Amino acid sequence: MELKLLNDQGQAASNVAAPDTIFGRDYNEALIHQVVVAYQANARSGNRKQKDREEVHHTTKKPWRQKGTGRARAGMSSSPLWRGGGRIFPNSPDENFSHKVNKKMYRAGVCSILSQLAREGRLSVIENLSVEAPKTKLLSQKLKGMGLDSVLVITDSLDENLLLASRNLPNVLICEPRHADPVSLVFYKKILITKLALAKIEEMLA
């Protein structure tokens, strides 16, 4: 598999060889779905909380006598059938949403995503991406000149100017290879990888 190698102006200069074991895999939609869902589920904090009939504010006094009123039987105001009553099966903050995915499956899913991106022409390699100063305008103009509006940039190391310049751009994310997660790879329209970062990705996923 050969990927387009861009120069600093975003123009295709040449091609760079990439291993087929990472960028030449078949598209496995079921595996990609499993990996993405598992990653999102594992990121959940689990902070939902609802009260059961014991925790809501209530009194144990019987609202009316058992018989003779013609109304339905009622025991106390915390009944889940009543307005303001407790939930029957409340959500708890200690609920575990995590999904287990084996390392081999995770790597295979990421490789399948990268392979599909390469086939669609959405993945490119660049010699280096940098800005002279931590200015959002400079980075925005550079990316606009390359025709990139929604892009994930994977660099071998985080450049402070580049990181600060990208913070106010909603559709731009700068990260290192170890932080390139499957959700980000699927979300952004274009993926830009520096040449040194490509070597690290090959080492990680080999």
UniProtKB/Swiss-Prot annotation:
SUPFAM superfamilies: Ribosomal protein L4
Cysteine pairs bridged by disulfides in the record: none
Location of the region described as Disordered in the Swiss-Prot/TrEMBL record: 43-78
Ranges annotated as biased composition (Basic and acidic residues): 49-58
Function in brief: One of the primary rRNA binding proteins, this protein initially binds near the 5'-end of the 23S rRNA. It is important during the early stages of 50S assembly. It makes multiple contacts with different domains of the 23S rRNA in the assembled 50S subunit and ribosome. Forms part of the polypeptide exit tunnel.
Species of origin: Janthinobacterium sp. (strain Marseille) (Minibacterium massiliensis)
Example GO biological process: translation
Single annotated GO MF: rRNA binding
Basic residues bias locations: 59-70
Protein name: Large ribosomal subunit protein uL4
GO cellular component: ribonucleoprotein complex; ribosome
Gene from which this protein is expressed: rplD
NCBIfam families hit by this protein: rplD_bact (TIGR03953)
Statement: the UniProt record of this protein carries the keyword Iron: no
